[in-house]
A protein has these predicted regions:
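Short secondary-structure capping/junction motifs at helix and strand boundaries
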Residues: 35, 170-175, 582-592, 603-614
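Active-site-adjacent bridging/hinge elements
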Residues: 411-414, 502-512, 542-550, 626-638, ...
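The feature captures the catalytic groove of carbohydrate-active enzymes
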Residues: 422, 426, 430-457, 558-566, ...
Length: 699
């Protein structure tokens, strides 16, 4: 029997067919009764292999996107206040937020800010993120609280359950403030062209290639996955330009693919740019036209045009080659007729955060229409003692609290720098040891769709509440008896993990949803997100896969991977864990070449990587981030000593382990040449650590 257990365990751990010959020999050498048992065991193991080998990751996730595409348009994406968000258009960098803010009537008001402690907690979020609960603690511990649960019903609707609980021996008078508002990417373009314009616009950052003469260490690893020379500015029509020394050196060149439409075979190309006052940036233009482009500087954005002619409509190239006179900020270029280009109008774009508000007859709902958003949004609630208000201030945590005693005004006017549409439900009187659940509906769509959903909510609320279902894959069912005592803590950890996701984050020319180590870090973070992926593996395999994929790039990309922070190979650790947990050959194959590209760059095999130290062969990453080992409590070593000769041991050690992981994957995928390369790297780095990792001076 010991041999049987050994065989089963070996098979389960390896999932490799090489165990089968050993099992077959054991069957042949056994008596009939044992053979029957072993044959049954063999059938079970085949079933286990088949089940474990199936991909649990949807085919739609095997893309080049850096977004967590398996998420819904609704989710906890806000960078301001805890609640539910809706993304009307992933490309726009715009987000609609809705937050419930409980409090005591004319007394303490909770403002659940996501950036600091504010008496709310991510309480229970299921793995699919279709049910999101926050607890608002008004009197410690569990004496007076409100649990707000967002049930995502479909792409148009989220039902909100607000359970107010009084566990004290006296009456409690509570309030619920429902806040709706629009939010944007932090720096929005201040200018636009008319929507009915008869011209084509091309962003300068949408190039097919951008080749500077001087290749910096960041040539194949642009920070945050941005494009080369990409720079954010509100003066741009898109929010981003080619700047940061673009065109500074003679021979710098950028290429574009343009599409000439029928009837536009002859026209003008108008370049929008900003060159410093008194300077001129010049380029040779090739491709669709041969010309010399002079971008004379005024210190402001201007448009200069050159003619083009082509025989027929279709795709053409446009190449700009710098003459090295001076750098410029290139916003992009227009294509149109000579008359159209001459009449280009650049209009001011006012950031619109004040909606048109239409309240219902019962004053228990309102519909919002924001100028910059095509969607309508509707809010409805089933509590009669309520008032619809507007709050005009950008800091609710101070201004709104000051207005706690103003329970009469319909407009609370502060600095007018932001707008919140507010449903004020008050008072909610709770008898001793009682609770009350109030429901609200947040919906989106066309004006007609939103009106219909609101009417259904008021007329037949039970149809919505009946849609609330328990999770089909309840996590508690998967916990062993001895682990039940840890379930509360595990649930809170899962909720914290899944609530730390934000939108929008900009990378690779797109806005994405992104899991963060905390919403204070409103950015990418490479090694932190590797650890987040490790945690997600035990929560949701698909999200874990997408979290790893988000930091990889297709082979041959401008950036070897998405880099922010200390460049450690934690994505490779998550890759190994994902493989062990899923046995997904598809995931193994898809991620392997991307992670190999990551690994090759960090071990100095990319010709533009500067990680390999001359002489020792150890790895150092000072050119890519100040803190090579990721320590937050030590000063950066390169600032204290010569960065050319000092490097932390941990960097090389990390990539030895990464090499061992990728070697296993290469063996599984049959890449014999890669296996030899990894073995060589392991040997080189291991040998280098022995003589060069001891510092006599520091001991």
């Amino acid at each position: 029997m010991d041999n049987l257990y050994f065989l089963l365990n070996s098979f389960y751990l390896s999932k490799k067919s090489k165990v089968l010959p050993l099992l077959q020999r054991t069957i042949l050498n056994s008596n009939m009764k044992t053979k029957q048992s072993l044959m049954m065991l063999l059938m079970i193991m085949f079933w286990i292999t088949s089940a474990l080998g199936q991909s649990t990751i949807p085919p739609s996730c095997f893309t080049d996107s850096h977004d967590i595409t398996s998420l819904q348009a609704w989710g906890p994406y806000s960078k301001r206040y805890a609640g539910i968000s809706h993304i009307p258009d992933m490309k726009a960098g715009m987000r609609f937020d809705f937050s419930v803010m409980p409090g005591y009537y004319r007394n303490r008001q909770l403002i659940p800010h996501v950036l600091f402690e504010s008496s709310y907690y991510p309480w229970d979020i299921n793995s699919s993120m279709s049910r999101i609960t926050y607890r608002y603690e008004m009197e410690w511990k569990d004496r007076v609280f409100t649990d707000v649960t967002y049930y995502i019903l479909d792409e148009h609707r989220t039902l909100v359950g607000m359970n107010c609980v009084n566990n004290t021996a006296v009456n409690q008078n509570l309030v619920l403030n429902l806040m709706a508002y629009i939010d944007y990417e932090e720096e929005q373009p201040q200018f636009k062209i008319p929507e009915d314009s008869n011209i084509q616009w091309h962003n300068a950052t949408d190039y097919t290639s951008n080749e500077p003469v001087r290749k910096s260490p960041q040539y194949n690893l642009v920070y945050d996955g941005w494009n080369r020379n990409e720079m954010r500015t509100s003066q741009s029509l898109s929010g981003f330009v080619l700047g940061k020394g673009f065109g500074r050196d003679k021979g710098d060149k950028v290429n574009y693919e343009i599409n000439i439409l029928p009837g536009k075979e002859k026209g003008m190309i108008g370049f929008r740019y900003n060159t410093p006052k008194g300077k001129t940036s010049t380029f040779q233009v090739k491709g669709i036209t041969e010309s010399r482009l002079e971008l004379q500087g005024t210190g402001e954005y201007n448009i200069v045009s050159i003619p083009y002619t082509c025989k027929e409509p279709g795709k053409y190239t446009l190449e700009l080659i710098s003459e090295g006179t001076h750098s410029t900020d290139l916003d992009g270029f227009f294509i149109g007729s000579e008359e159209d280009i001459k009449q280009i109008k650049i209009l001011p774009r006012k950031l619109s955060f004040i909606p048109e508000i239409k309240s219902g007859k019962t004053k228990q709902d309102f519909i919002l229409k924001y100028p910059e958003c095509d969607n309508y949004y509707g809010i409805a609630w089933n509590y009669q003692e309520s008032q619809i208000r507007e709050v005009l201030d950008n800091n609710l945590e101070s201004f709104f609290r000051k207005k706690t005693h103003d329970h009469v005004s319909s407009r609370l006017i502060g600095n007018r720098e932001w707008h919140y549409s507010n449903a004020f439900l008050r008072p909610i009187v709770l008898a001793p040891h009682s609770e009350q659940t109030i429901y609200a509906l947040v919906c989106t769509g066309t004006s007609q769709q939103v009106n219909e959903q609101i009417q259904k909510f008021h007329s037949t609320p039970e149809t919505l509440t009946s849609l609330i279902q328990k999770d089909s894959n309840n996590s508690e069912d998967r916990i062993l008896a001895d682990g039940k005592k840890y379930e509360f803590g595990r649930r809170l950890l899962q909720s914290a993990l899944l609530s730390n996701i934000v939108y929008p984050v900009h990378t690779q020319g797109q806005y994405i949803r992104h899991f963060t180590p905390g919403k204070n870090w409103n950015s990418l973070y490479t090694w932190d997100s590797g650890f987040i992926a490790l945690g997600l593996i035990d929560v949701d395999i698909t999200k874990a896969f997408e979290c790893i994929r988000a930091y990889t790039t297709p082979v041959g990309s401008e950036s070897a991977f998405i880099h922010h922070g200390t460049p450690l190979p934690i994505q490779m650790y998550a890759y190994y864990d994902l493989w062990n947990n899923t046995q997904s050959k598809e995931a193994l194959q898809f991620l392997y070449p991307r992670l190999k590209q990551f690994f090759d760059f960090m071990t100095g095999k990319n010709p533009y990587s500067t990680t390999r130290m001359k002489g020792s062969g150890l790895l150092r990453t000072w050119d890519y981030f100040y803190n090579s080992g990721g320590w937050d409590d030590y000063p950066p070593q390169h600032a204290l000593r010569d960065k050319a000769s000092v490097t932390p041991v941990v960097t090389s050690a990390y990539y030895i382990r990464a090499a061992k992981i990728l070697r296993l994957a290469a063996k599984e995928l049959g890449f014999k040449k890669d296996v030899k390369e990894y073995e060589q790297t392991i040997k080189q780095l291991s040998n280098a650590l022995q003589p060069y990792s001891w510092d006599k001076e520091t001991g």
